[in-house]
UniProtKB/Swiss-Prot annotation:
Sections of the chain in a coiled coil: none
GO biological process: cellular response to desiccation; cellular response to gamma radiation; DNA damage response; DNA repair
Domain of life: Bacteria
Higher taxonomy: Bacteria, Thermotogati, Deinococcota, Deinococci, Deinococcales
Task of the protein: Appears to contribute to D.radiodurans capacity to survive exposure to ionizing radiation. May play a role in DNA repair and genome reconstitution.
Keyword Kinase listed: no
Biased composition, class Basic and acidic residues, residue ranges: 136-180
Induction description: Induced to high levels following extreme ionizing radiation exposure. Also highly induced in response to desiccation stress.
The name this protein goes by in its record: DNA damage response protein D
Gene behind the chain: ddrD
Region described as Disordered: spans on this chain: 124-198
Annotated knockout phenotype: Cells lacking this gene show a normal growth rate, do not exhibit a decrease in the efficiency of natural transformation, and is as resistant to ionizing radiation as wild-type. However, deletion of the ddrC gene decreases the ionizing radiation resistance of the recA mutant strain, and appears to increase that of the pprA mutant strain. Moreover, cells lacking both ddrC and ddrD exhibit a slight (two-fold) increase in sensitivity to ionizing radiation, but this phenotype is apparent only at the highest applied doses.
Length: 198
């Protein structure tokens, strides 16, 4: 399964991702309150007020880690956790921590998260093509040419191996022929020497 198809299978889980992102922002806000030593906060659709030794009110809060939590998101998520609508919500730090813990537990046991786990398992089990998708025509032609070249090279190497070596000519047969040639008859030679002249 290629990367684009894997990404496409995640589209069914966008609502889960948005819920996780919203909850993450509220968790970050709670951590920032603890870091600052704030005792409580007051949230409306347009403002976040942190109440502590140094109270502050702003349309958004930027944590020491650079995370930004806007009032509209925090107000909406906190309203969902509280379970009722109100112009503003006031919670202390302990109550906010309890609300966040309950939200995390509900998310872990949700059908949406189980469905996401099934999708991950299906993606992991899908075969992958390390070479990537084949380009029509071009890749096929290149592969055919490469196979033909490899075949020709193998044929040439096999022919070179099977061709019998040409025997070297040796001087030995000449010597044999010289030794085997008829020699003058020694007796005839001696007879000629003993024949009296006329």
């Amino acid at each position: 399964m290629d990367t684009l198809k894997k990404a496409g299978t995640m589209l069914a889980h966008l609502d889960l991702f948005h819920s996780m992102l919203d909850l993450r922002r509220l968790l970050q806000l709670a951590a920032y309150m603890k870091e600052r030593g704030d005792r409580a906060m007051l949230i409306s659709a347009g403002e976040i007020t942190l109440i502590g030794s140094e109270s502050m009110t702003a349309p958004e809060v930027v944590t020491s880690k650079g995370e930004t939590i806007d009032a509209a998101t925090a107000y909406r998520v906190l309203g969902q956790l509280e379970g009722y609508e109100a112009p503003e919500y006031a919670v202390n730090r302990e109550a906010l921590a309890a609300l966040n813990a309950r939200a995390v537990a509900e998310l872990e046991g949700s059908e949406a998260l189980r469905a996401f786990g099934d999708t991950l398992a299906r993606i992991s089990a899908a075969p992958t093509d390390p070479a990537g998708p084949e380009r029509p025509g071009t890749d096929r032609a290149e592969r055919t040419a490469a196979e033909r070249t490899a075949s020709e090279r193998a044929t040439h190497d096999r022919a070179s191996t099977e061709r019998p070596a040409r025997p070297r000519r040796s001087a030995e047969p000449e010597a044999v022929r010289t030794e085997d040639a008829p020699q003058p008859n020694a007796e005839a030679s001696e007879a000629g020497e003993n024949t009296p002249a006329a």
